[in-house]
């Protein structure tokens, strides 16, 4: 068996085209366009690349994009004050603070300062809680994008044994909740998990998000499984690779996401979907 690649780039582009059409229709109807505030603290090169991609995507779709590039020495209070301003700005539907933040700033305090109806990253405890209670509104972008990729395969997720490798607040934990909502029997694995190989070998669906190149050997993948590789790691050679050993995994799996061009584009597409959703559902009556 040779796996079929799940083309995240093409699926994300289709979503962006639909969103652009909706924004155009809003303009023609005399409605305002969605607005996204993107806040970057410091000059982390990877963060600068991600933020640049998000800003360009906003402009391409006709969203308002507000950029705030703050020095790494910016105080926590100053950042919280800026978030307060964006919370009150009626032209802003979504607020994104690029993570990670400098060590002197407490991430949880920053995330909780963003109004839940403007939390387009889906990290606020309110929005994570809504997902846990099976009534999601603004969902975490990467898991949301992954669910779209899984749906694109046409495979019925109800009753599948799913394994999520990685338990971060950004991907692993909300991913497990999404899969539970989709009817999977879900196991979350982390650094203390025993017999990881045994768990992965039994999985019909594997999502890996640990940030370690080739962490999951391709031989572990069950024949016919769906493999979602969230990792994006740059080797010394400059090559980008995922957390799963792709070539061997692709021999066993039925569907697999490539790196790059799999999960990455979907994260930004989901962010844009969330921003339009916040505009339409929460703020059109403001």
Swiss-Prot record:
Pfam families: THF_DHG_CYH, THF_DHG_CYH_C
Keywords: Amino-acid biosynthesis, Histidine biosynthesis, Hydrolase, Methionine biosynthesis, Multifunctional enzyme, NADP, One-carbon metabolism, Oxidoreductase, Purine biosynthesis
GO CC annotations, alphabetized: cytosol
Any one Gene Ontology molecular-function term assigned to this protein's record: methenyltetrahydrofolate cyclohydrolase activity
Domain of life: Bacteria
Recorded catalytic activity of this chain's protein: (6R)-5,10-methylene-5,6,7,8-tetrahydrofolate + NADP(+) = (6R)-5,10-methenyltetrahydrofolate + NADPH; (6R)-5,10-methenyltetrahydrofolate + H2O = (6R)-10-formyltetrahydrofolate + H(+)
One of the GO biological process terms: tetrahydrofolate interconversion
Record EC number: 1.5.1.5, 3.5.4.9
Family of the protein in this entry: Belongs to the tetrahydrofolate dehydrogenase/cyclohydrolase family.
Subunit structure as annotated in this protein's UniProt entry: Homodimer.
Function recorded in the entry: Catalyzes the oxidation of 5,10-methylenetetrahydrofolate to 5,10-methenyltetrahydrofolate and then the hydrolysis of 5,10-methenyltetrahydrofolate to 10-formyltetrahydrofolate.
UniProt name for this protein: Bifunctional protein FolD
